From Swiss-Prot:
Pfam families: KH_2 (PF07650), Ribosomal_S3_C (PF00189)
Gene name, Swiss-Prot/TrEMBL: rps3
Keyword RNA-binding among record annotations: yes
Family: Belongs to the universal ribosomal protein uS3 family.
Keywords: Ribonucleoprotein, Ribosomal protein, RNA-binding, rRNA-binding
GO annotation terms (biological process): translation
Protein name (record): Small ribosomal subunit protein uS3
Alphabetized GO MF terms: rRNA binding; structural constituent of ribosome
């Protein structure tokens, strides 16, 4: 009898988390929203919001936070919610922040290729292993197409996708229509599975590793 309740609990919890994440992404797009975490505590819920500009989410004197707490209680059913806003340590390595930057630039009628090249260069200068930016829509004509720019190494499958690859999508509303933006960033990591390191050996170390063959000398035997 308890299994259906446990299953429905986790389904409701996941749906609530996804809906809250989409709401915060649309509401705080200009604040550099980077993601959120939802925790269940003994007294209620705890929400941690990550953003590039935390002050735009907190508001003057916490006014926006208080409104946000009311919205979470009435529309999402989060009773006794505690909200924490944390800054992002590396905004240039966060795919969602980069995608929102591209969206804001496109909505200002900045050429898409210039925006993509500038953001790609900025991500790689921040230390990313690889990055890929895809912009789709009516870019040059009435027919929809896409433009893909990438640099470095991109992982499409395997365990590395779950650990070091960050992906985000966004959409920009223009007069010509809707532009889709997809950003993939491979964050810096220690060693990938296909990493091969060739060590340099000093000459004196090489002499110790390779045995030196001694030349045999033929001693002449003098007759008695």
């Amino acid at each position: 009898m308890t299994r259906p309740r446990v299953k429905s609990y986790f389904i409701d919890y996941s749906l609530k988390k996804v809906m809250l994440d989409e709401f915060l992404a649309n509401y705080f797009k200009d604040a550099g929203y980077a993601g959120m975490e939802l925790y269940k505590t003994p007294t209620g819920y705890r929400v941690v919001i990550y953003a590039e500009y935390p002050g735009r989410i907190i508001g003057r004197g916490g006014s926006i936070i208080r409104k946000l707490m009311t919205i979470m209680q009435t529309h999402f059913g989060l009773e006794n919610v505690n909200i924490t806003v944390s800054p992002v340590p590396d905004p240039d390595l966060n795919a969602r922040i980069v995608a929102f930057r591209i969206v804001r630039a496109l909505e200002k009628e900045i050429p898409y290729r210039r925006v993509a090249m500038a953001m790609l260069r900025r991500v790689m200068e921040a230390g990313a292993v690889g990055a890929e930016i895809i912009i789709s829509g009516k870019l040059r004509s009435e027919r929809a197409r896409y433009e893909k720019l990438k640099a470095g190494r991109i992982y499409k499958a395997g365990d590395m996708v779950d650990y070091v690859v960050d992906r985000a999508v966004g959409k920009a509303l223009l007069k010509r229509g809707v532009y889709g933006v997809e950003v993939v960033i491979v964050r810096p990591h220690l060693k990938p599975p296909d990493y091969v390191e060739i060590k340099s050996v000093k000459p004196e170390e090489l002499a110790d590793l390779i045995p030196v063959e001694k030349e045999e000398t033929n001693e002449s035997i003098s007759p008695q």
